[in-house]
């Protein structure tokens, strides 16, 4: 609902942009200390790697439309196989950010993917000396961006009158859902 002054100008109310906007879709981070910054070897320190996924955009992402792979190291060094680190899916559907009835922004879903798959643990094997490993999450997902603009279509697009309801020429504002 919007209110108008006597002049007909809007004085607040509903947002004029149909989208929240932004430049992010799914944000991807490791949970704190996951993987841990340091472990002891010889199977004496088991651990998981937890990837946090948050939908910062305006499109819903189904569980089956997102795959997470853990890469950057040989899983055999931690008692696992490459299959234990491939094509993991999040626990939940990633619902988008939305605008509430009062105009407030409702945050999108945050969900998690745990490695290795199947609820098991990484168990560091025996290493010679200190060894650094790179853990990286590669995430592939289907996403969409929508846009909207108002066009001006008149009965006579050649002989445009000064008092026409709209102007078909010139630049138009394009609204985008971002990402």
PLM regions with names:
Residues 4-179:
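Non-catalytic macromolecular-recognition regions in eukaryotic signaling proteins
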């Amino acid at each position: 609902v919007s209110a108008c002054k006597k002049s007909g100008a809007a004085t607040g109310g509903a947002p004029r942009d149909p989208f929240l906007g932004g430049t992010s879709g799914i944000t991807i981070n490791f949970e704190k200390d996951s993987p841990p910054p340091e472990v002891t070897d010889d199977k004496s320190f088991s651990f998981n790697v937890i990837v946090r996924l948050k939908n910062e955009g305006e499109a819903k992402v189904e569980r089956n439309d997102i795959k997470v792979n853990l890469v950057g190291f040989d899983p055999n060094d931690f008692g696992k196989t490459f299959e234990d680190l491939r094509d993991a899916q999040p626990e939940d559907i990633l619902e988008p950010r939305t605008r509430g009835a009062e105009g407030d922004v409702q945050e999108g879903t945050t969900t998690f993917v745990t490695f290795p798959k199947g609820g098991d643990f990484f168990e560091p094997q025996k290493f010679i000396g200190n060894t650094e490993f790179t853990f990286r999450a590669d995430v592939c997902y289907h996403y969409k961006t929508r846009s909207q603009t108002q066009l001006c279509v008149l009965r006579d697009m050649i002989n445009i009158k000064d008092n026409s309801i709209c102007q078909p020429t010139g630049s138009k504002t394009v609204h985008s859902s971002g990402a």
